[in-house]
């Protein structure tokens, strides 16, 4: 494992982002980036020296863009934009998301389209490397003109203002700068705007959600396979020939996952020739459902891969031609739509899992004891655990409502159509919490269902999952305090302990 990575601006992959964050690597900017960064900054300096009027350099902002600012006030202008825009509210974003925001902002500014000094980029790198994380409230951005409010909070510590977190402790920005070997910066022309303009918060929130959603996808394949066995379901619907006729590669891949997980199940062989003709859709149609989920996640990944390297500042500096152009790359519509698609996928993961829990606890379908407990009546078993799953699934349906169709004009109608990308991405994390809860309950219910098939065993692959669950949660022979069991399995899920890759590598 390397302790640092060389950042080639504009060349981050999703895999490299995961590796950088998971391994806590520090960042070293490739020297090849220095020339363009410096040329871009000199292009801005030339505008000032030639007394030209260019938006963002020597004008007001938003609907105040027509007001020209004198040269002796330009530094104050850049400081003011950071201070005035730092008006967020809500819970602070977690450190792992802030680390990703810093990485994306460094990657953005280092490509040489923003006109900032190398010194400013190096200051952001120092914060990232020393794990000094600015305190960023979660609410305040509408996803155009970029993530202005949260990025203002990201920028405050560079001025010696606000607070930061380091090793979980809240400290002053001044203390944080010292830890990173920095002193407060005096921003030069365009630098405040360059820090604030951009979609790094929306992108980081969406990327973080995507990475966790990949884990939930794998867990859902596993828990769904366990439910098939616990409910004495059939593996025939996972036959490759069926899925080849449909032609969707994601569905074909999902079906293969179910086949591999269920292969060798003694439980399946014991009822292969029973009278049940077909299983309910939540069992039988899992490849079709989860294939569609996988397809959406792949689309979201492709979109965010581009956005992680995208330039979303305004105006943009094209140093080679000496041009500074105003456009709208700060508009986060594509991130909002990607987040909406991921929300649909998360809702379907949780919704289908909730239906399988309902099947397992229904003795008339599953043939298992009512609510998966002996002496039902005296014991309620999984009756109310299913209610919790239903509550979370229903919550997800409301949260899945598209945010990209919403817009409210801001800045005196200068910014008259906004994307809501930040809220679209932020709500994914609430959906992740709901979905991981549902999957934890399904894993518990399916493993409890397996108890009633003994001495028959599930497949070798699924037995590893069963043993992992039982290592922290014993079987239910009577009612007990249920919530801690859900939390134990939920933690295992989010710690990536129920992974298809893990099973393959064992």
Curated annotation (Swiss-Prot):
Q: Which CDD domains match?
A: PAL-HAL
Give the signal sequence positions: none
Q: Tell me where it resides.
A: Cytoplasm
Q: Which GO terms describe its biological process?
A: L-histidine catabolic process to glutamate and formamide; L-histidine catabolic process to glutamate and formate
Describe the processing and modification events after translation. Answer: Contains an active site 4-methylidene-imidazol-5-one (MIO), which is formed autocatalytically by cyclization and dehydration of residues Ala-Ser-Gly.
Note the InterPro entries from the entry: Aromatic_Lyase, Fumarase/histidase_N, HutH, L-Aspartase-like, Phe/His_NH3-lyase_AS
**UniProt keyword Iron, yes or no:** no
| Domain of life, per lineage | Bacteria
Q: Where is this cross-link: 5-imidazolinone (Ala-Gly)?
A: 144-146
Example GO CC term: the record gives: cytoplasm
Which molecular function GO terms apply here? histidine ammonia-lyase activity
Q: Which residues carry this modification: 2,3-didehydroalanine (Ser)?
A: 145
Q: Does the keyword Cytoplasm apply?
A: yes
Q: Which reaction does it catalyse?
A: L-histidine = trans-urocanate + NH4(+)
- Pathway of action: Amino-acid degradation; L-histidine degradation into L-glutamate; N-formimidoyl-L-glutamate from L-histidine: step 1/3
Q: Cite the entry's keywords alphabetically.
A: Cytoplasm, Histidine metabolism, Lyase
Family under the similarity heading: Belongs to the PAL/histidase family.
Q: Which HAMAP family match?
A: His_ammonia_lyase (MF_00229)
Q: What is this protein called?
A: Histidine ammonia-lyase
């Amino acid at each position: 494992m390397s302790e640092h990575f060389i950042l080639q601006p504009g060349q981050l992959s999703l895999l490299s982002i995961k590796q950088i964050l998971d391994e806590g690597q520090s960042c070293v900017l490739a020297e090849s980036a220095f020339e363009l960064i410096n040329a871009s900054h000199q292009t801005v300096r030339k505008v000032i020296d030639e007394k030209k009027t260019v938006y963002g350099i020597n004008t007001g902002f938003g609907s105040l863009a027509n007001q020209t600012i004198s040269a002796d006030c330009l530094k104050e202008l850049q400081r003011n934009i950071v201070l005035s825009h730092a008006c967020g509210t809500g819970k602070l974003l977690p450190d792992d998301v802030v680390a990703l925001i810093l990485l994306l902002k460094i990657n953005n500014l280092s490509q040489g389209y923003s006109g900032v000094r190398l010194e400013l980029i190096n200051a952001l790198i120092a914060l990232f490397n020393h794990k000094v994380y600015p305190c960023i409230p979660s609410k305040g951005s509408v996803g155009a003109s970029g993530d202005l409010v949260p990025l203002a909070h990201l920028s405050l510590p560079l001025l010696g203002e606000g607070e930061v977190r380091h090793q979980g402790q809240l400290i002053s920005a001044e203390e944080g700068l010292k830890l990173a070997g920095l002193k407060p910066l005096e921003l030069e022309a365009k630098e405040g705007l360059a820090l604030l303009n951009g979609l790094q918060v929306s992108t980081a929130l969406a990327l973080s959600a995507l990475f966790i959603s990949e884990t939930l996808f794998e867990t859902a394949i596993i828990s769904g396979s366990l439910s098939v066995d616990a409910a004495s379901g059939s593996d025939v619907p996972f036959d490759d020939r069926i899925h080849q006729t449909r032609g969707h590669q994601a569905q074909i891949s999902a079906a293969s996952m179910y086949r591999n997980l269920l292969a060798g199940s003694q439980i399946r062989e014991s009822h292969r020739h029973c009278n049940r003709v077909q299983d309910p859709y939540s069992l039988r149609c899992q490849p079709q459902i989860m294939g569609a989920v996988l397809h959406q996640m792949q689309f979201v990944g492709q979109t965010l891969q581009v956005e992680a390297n995208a330039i979303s500042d305004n105006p943009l500096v094209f140093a080679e031609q000496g041009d500074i152009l105003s456009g709208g790359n700060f508009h986060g519509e594509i991130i909002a739509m990607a987040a909406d698609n991921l929300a649909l996928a998360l809702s379907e993961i949780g919704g289908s899992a909730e239906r399988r829990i309902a099947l397992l606890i229904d003795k008339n379908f599953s043939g298992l004891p009512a609510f998966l407990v002996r002496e039902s009546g005296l014991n309620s078993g999984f009756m109310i655990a299913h209610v919790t799953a239903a509550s979370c699934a229903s919550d997800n349906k409301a949260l899945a409502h598209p945010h990209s169709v919403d817009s409210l004009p801001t800045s005196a109608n200068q910014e008259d159509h906004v994307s809501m990308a930040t809220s679209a991405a932020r709500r994914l994390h609430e959906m992740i919490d709901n979905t991981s809860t549902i999957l934890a309950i399904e894993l518990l219910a399916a493993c409890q269902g397996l108890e009633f098939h003994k001495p028959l065993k599930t497949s070798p692959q699924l037995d590893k999952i069963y043993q992992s669950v039982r290592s922290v949660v014993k079987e239910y022979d009577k009612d007990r305090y249920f919530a801690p069991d859900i939390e134990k399995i939920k933690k295992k899920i989010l710690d990536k302990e129920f992974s298809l890759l893990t099973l393959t590598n064992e």
